């Protein structure tokens, strides 16, 4: 009996997760912080697509720009991740401590991705390396 209840519970959770999907949204439907971020850092770049991932807990947003940039925001419009297809992540986005570390240790390398985690920051460089920093901006990991 416990197995049947467990199986039904698992199937119910799976069905709810599978039902959560991306829904197209307009620029105006994005959280205010996300709109400000986009207009401040990508003035004049066309938004190709914006969507809301309506998951079980809190929705989040994904925006794709005409230059190939992909940006993820949380429910409140705070940046979660930015990925550049060409060029570097705009300089005002990455914390100065992270930028200084990259500049001092990796000359002629661009920051292509920047991700904000609960306890860390992560950047992916144009040379393929991924650097992970704690919230005190100390390097805690390198992955290639």
Regions found by a protein language model. Give the residues of each.
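Bacterial N-terminal signal peptides
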Residues: 7-15
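Short amphipathic alpha-helical "recognition" segments used for binding
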Residues: 6-7, 103
């Amino acid at each position: 009996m416990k197995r049947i209840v467990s199986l039904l519970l698992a199937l119910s959770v799976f069905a709810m997760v599978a039902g959560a999907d991306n829904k197209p949204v307009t620029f105006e439907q994005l959280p205010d912080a996300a709109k400000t971020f986009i207009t401040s850092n990508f003035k004049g770049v066309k938004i190709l697509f914006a969507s809301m991932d309506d998951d079980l807990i809190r929705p989040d947003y994904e925006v794709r720009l005409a230059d190939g940039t992909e940006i993820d925001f949380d429910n409140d419009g705070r940046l979660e991740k930015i990925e550049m297809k060409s060029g570097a992540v705009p300089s005002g986005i990455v914390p100065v401590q992270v930028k200084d570390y990259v500049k001092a240790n990796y000359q002629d390398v661009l920051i292509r991705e920047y991700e904000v985690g609960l306890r860390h920051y992560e950047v992916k460089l144009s040379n393929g390396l991924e650097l992970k920093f704690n919230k005190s901006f100390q390097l805690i990991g390198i992955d290639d």
